């Protein structure tokens, strides 16, 4: 796999890497997609496919990381949305389905549990890096002082992911649905 690309940025880096021969040495390329509107995935995957085709059409595309938070006070990507556990579950389902409708080899969800992002911490100052990202399908349980106690509780997104995983656990083939009208 040849690295991960943040699709919110232009593909200039990937183009430059392919231009100096990277495409000859990789089997797949991964992208990370943190977006509120999952429909942008279609054009981003199409653009990435076009770039790969120019240098090596055999390269597979992997959606290596995406997700959303379940609280609006979290740290990390997409932290400024009015997120709730219900909105997180809906976004998880919409984004996974959008991924599966493209040609990605597989799709990944970030993450299994809420965790410390440690984006602005100072070494030796524990309180400075207790900044949680609430991306998990399992929610961290906190004590009265706001510290994680090491227990995790399933969120609605956990059950959504469990259900969609069960639906697609066997051999599944993508099929185009007819969206036109039947002539009379």
Language model: regions and residue ranges:
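Noncatalytic carbohydrate-binding groove/subsite architecture in carbohydrate-active enzymes
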Residues: 1-107, 117-119
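Aromatic- and carboxylate-lined catalytic core of secreted/periplasmic carbohydrate-active enzymes
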Residues: 96-184
């Amino acid at each position: 796999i040849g690295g991960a690309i943040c699709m919110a940025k232009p593909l200039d880096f990937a183009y430059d890497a392919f231009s100096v021969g990277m495409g000859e040495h990789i089997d797949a390329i991964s992208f990370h997609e943190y977006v509120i509107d999952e429909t942008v995935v279609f054009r981003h995957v199409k653009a990435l496919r076009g770039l790969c085709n120019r240098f090596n059409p055999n390269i597979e595309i992997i959606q290596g990381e995406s997700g959303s938070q379940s609280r609006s006070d979290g740290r990390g990507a997409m932290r400024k949305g009015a997120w709730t556990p219900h909105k997180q579950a809906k976004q998880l389902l919409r984004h996974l389905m959008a991924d599966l409708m493209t040609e990605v080899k597989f799709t990944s969800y970030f993450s299994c549990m809420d965790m410390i992002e440690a984006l602005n911490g100072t070494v030796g100052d524990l309180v400075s890096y207790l900044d949680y990202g609430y991306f998990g399908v399992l929610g961290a349980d906190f004590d009265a002082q706001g510290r994680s106690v090491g227990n995790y509780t399933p969120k609605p997104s956990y059950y959504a992911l469990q259900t969609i995983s069960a639906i697609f656990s066997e051999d599944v083939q993508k099929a185009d649905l007819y969206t036109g009208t039947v002539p009379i």
